[in-house]
Amino acid sequence: MRLLAPILLLTLTGCGYHQVGSATNIPASVRTLAVPVFATNAQAFHTEMAFTQATIRELNTRTKSRIITSDSDSADATLHGTILSQTVAPLTYDGATGQSSSYLITITAKVLLTAHDGHVLYRNDAFVYHEQYQSTQDLSGFIQEDNHAVNRVAKDFAQAVVSDMLESF
C-alpha cells in the first residue's frame, strides 16, 4: 500500500491531470473582459451575432469577470472571434419531390483572447461545428430552420470556447 500511493501520485502528475480551474488561460488579474461582435467572412445573416451573444452568455454564466459587449481600452482582456465560413449542404432527398428534406450546416470559427498589453492569452483557429436540420415542403407553414441550427451551433461553440479557456482540456 505504501508503494501504491507514490506510484499513483507520480502517474497522475505525469499525465497532465489538474484540478478544475487550475489550468485557466484567463489570469486572475482579468476582471473585465471585452467581447466585441465577432467578425465574419461568411455570407450569412446574423451568424456572428448569434455566436457573440452565446459566448457572452456562457462567459457570464461561468466566470466572475465583468463582460463588456464592445471593444474597450478599459478592459483587462479582449476576446475577438471570427466566423471563417458557413456552408449548408443537402443531406437527404425526398424521392417523391426530388427536393432536399434535410441539410447539414457547417460553421468554422476562430477566437483570440489578448491581454490589455497585447499578450496572447488564448488562441484557437480551428473550431468546426456541424448541425443537421429538417426543411419543410409546406410553403404556407415554412419556417426557416437554419436560424435555429445556427443558434444550436453557437451554443455548442460558446460552451467549448469557454471550457477550453477555463479548463484547457
Feature-to-residue mapping (PLM):
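Residues embedded in well-ordered secondary-structure elements
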Residues: 4, 24, 70, 98-100
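N-terminal start-of-chain detector that recognizes signal peptides
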Residues: 7-9, 38-40, 49-56, 78-86, ...
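A structural "domain/chain start" motif
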Residues: 15-64, 71, 88, 117, ...
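Conserved acidic
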Residues: 43, 47, 101, 145, ...
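Surface-exposed short loop/turn segments
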Residues: 63-66, 76-124, 130-148
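Compositionally biased, intrinsically disordered linkers/stalks adjacent to structured regions
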Residues: 143-169
